[in-house]
C-alpha cells in the first residue's frame, strides 16, 4: 500500500459550507434535515415515496439533509465562468469543495505540489432535478419496453 498524506479538507453539508460550520451545527444539536421538495428531485417527491421500507425503486422517507442555500461562485476556475454557472450543482459542489480543500492545504495554485495530488469525493445527492431531466427519457423507454413485454 502506498503512503498518502491528507493535506487539506473541505466539505459542503446542509446548512454548512465549511467543516467548521458543520461541526458547530453538530455540537449545537441543530437539525438541518428537511423534507424533499420538487426543487431537490426535479419532480414531485411523492413519485419516489412509498411508506413501506423495501419497495423497489421507492424511498420510505423523504426527510434528508438537502443543500439548499449554497451559492456557487463560478469565478476563479480554469473554465469559463459562464460555462460553470450553467452546470448542475453536482458539478459545482465538487469544484467548490476541491478548491476549498486546496486552500486549506496551503498549496492552492502551487502546480509543482498539486501535480502529485489526488482527490477523494463522496456524494449522497441523488436524485437531483438535473439527473431526473437527463434520465427521464431512459426511464420512460425502459418502462415502456418492459410493459410491452409483459402485455404480449
Positions of predicted regions on the chain:
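Cys-dependent condensing catalytic cores that perform Claisen condensation/acyl-transfer
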Residues: 1-152
Amino acid at each position: 500500500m502506498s503512503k498518502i498524506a491528507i493535506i487539506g479538507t473541505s466539505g459542503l453539508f446542509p446548512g454548512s459550507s465549511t467543516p467548521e460550520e458543520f461541526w458547530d451545527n453538530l455540537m449545537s444539536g441543530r437539525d438541518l434535515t428537511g423534507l424533499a421538495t420538487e426543487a431537490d428531485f426535479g419532480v414531485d417527491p411523492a413519485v419516489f415515496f412509498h411508506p413501506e421500507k423495501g419497495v423497489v425503486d421507492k424511498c420510505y422517507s423523504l426527510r434528508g439533509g438537502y443543500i439548499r442555500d449554497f451559492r456557487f461562485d463560478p469565478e476563479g476556475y480554469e473554465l469559463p465562468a459562464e460555462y460553470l454557472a450553467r452546470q448542475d450543482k453536482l458539478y459545482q459542489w465538487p469544484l467548490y469543495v476541491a478548491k476549498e480543500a486546496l486552500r486549506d492545504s496551503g498549496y492552492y495554485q502551487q502546480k509543482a505540489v498539486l501535480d502529485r495530488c489526488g482527490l477523494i469525493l463522496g456524494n449522497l445527492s441523488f436524485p437531483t432535478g438535473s439527473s431526473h431531466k437527463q434520465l427521464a427519457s431512459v426511464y420512460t423507454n425502459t418502462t415502456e419496453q418492459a410493459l410491452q413485454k409483459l402485455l404480449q
